[in-house]
Amino acid sequence: YQQRYQELKILTINKFKNSDGSFGEGSQSGYAFAIELGLDDPKKLCALFVEKVKKDDYVFNSGIFAMALSYEILSKYGYDEVIENWLLRKEAPSYQQMLKSGNQVLAELFVGEHLSLNHAMFASYQQWYYQGLAGIKITDQAVGFDHIVFNPYFSKKVNDFTCQLDTKQGQITSSWHRCGHEINWELVVPVKKVNYQIKINNRYQEIKRISKNNQIIIKLIDSV
């Protein structure tokens, strides 16, 4: 299978890669799938992906499958703020524009006339609550949530966030509170069953860490 993958990878690159580094029609979907399939250096492709989103006025305009990939990929490579700007966008097309209809549910499409007004087609943003804001990311070698990296996006748009996840290994919680430049982050992880790693962006200075049983409390200072 690996040999066949390499053959198809070379074929796809030769057929669809453009001189500017994009793939296919140069769409956001093209970047998302190229990164997921490992067609080029992911960090370089992700930077180009973000430039494309900016050119599109920060609107995520992929289809159902690439949209889901976009949240995971952009968060993985540190572009959570781009995701946040899109989710909080008020002008059409946007999620908030969908909700202005008053029916309190998402529609099938952002634009168009023939569509369902109650459809979960673009509800994949929910994964970002877990992977981005909570920072709970399973690693490639994980089986049943037994390998996790904690690396949350401490948004400046919200002051409190709590995420609780029931897994085969036990309950995992990531909860943080922001007060000015201070951030108090609390983790609950079944330490005897889960191989975990805590990653903190260089912009944050760790002041204090307390670990007791399955609970970890970390105090940070945001330098930006």
Region roles according to the model:
Residues 1-116:
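Catalytic cores of carbohydrate-active enzymes
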Residues 2-3, 7, 81-224:
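Non-catalytic C-terminal accessory modules of carbohydrate-active enzymes
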